[in-house]
C-alpha cells in the first residue's frame, strides 16, 4: 500500500476565502454579496458600514480579504490602513473605487492596499482579485 501522507502535504487544501465587505451603502454591500455568491468559493464573514467596525472585525476575526469602500477612508484613515496592513500582513485589502483614476490607484498602493477595484466594474474585476487571494490562502493551508 502506498503512503499518500507526504503527497497530500504538498497539495494545497482549498478552503473558501473569508471576506469582509465594508461599504457605507447597505444596498451596495448586498450587491457585492450577490456577486460573491455567484463567484463561489468564498464566504462573507461579515459586513461593516464604518471604519471602526472594519478595524474591530479584522482584528477579532480571521479575514482573508477586506473589500473596503474608498469613501470610508479619509487621508488619516489611509494611514490607519497602512498600520492595519503592518499588523495583519496576511490580510489582503481590495479598495473599492467610486472614481477609478490612476491617482487613486497609486494612493491605494502607497498605503498598502493590495488591489483596486472600480465599483462600476466589480463583476468584471472581482474574480481576478479572488483568484489571487485564493492562491495565497491555498499556499498558507498547504
Language-model features and meaning:
Residues 79, 99-117, 121:
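Alpha4 helix (beta4-alpha4-beta5 surface) of REC/receiver domains from two-component response regulators
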Residues 66, 93, 116-117:
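Two-component signal transduction core modules
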Residues 47-65:
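Acidic, metal-coordinating helix/loop segments flanking the phosphotransfer/catalytic sites
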Residues 26-46:
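Two-component/phosphorelay signaling modules centered on CheY-like receiver
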Residues 67-84:
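Conserved phosphotransfer microenvironments
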Residues 1-20, 24-28, 124-142:
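Non-catalytic signal-transmission and effector/linker regions of two-component phosphorelay proteins
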Residues 59-61, 84-91, 111:
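Conserved phosphotransfer cores of two-component systems
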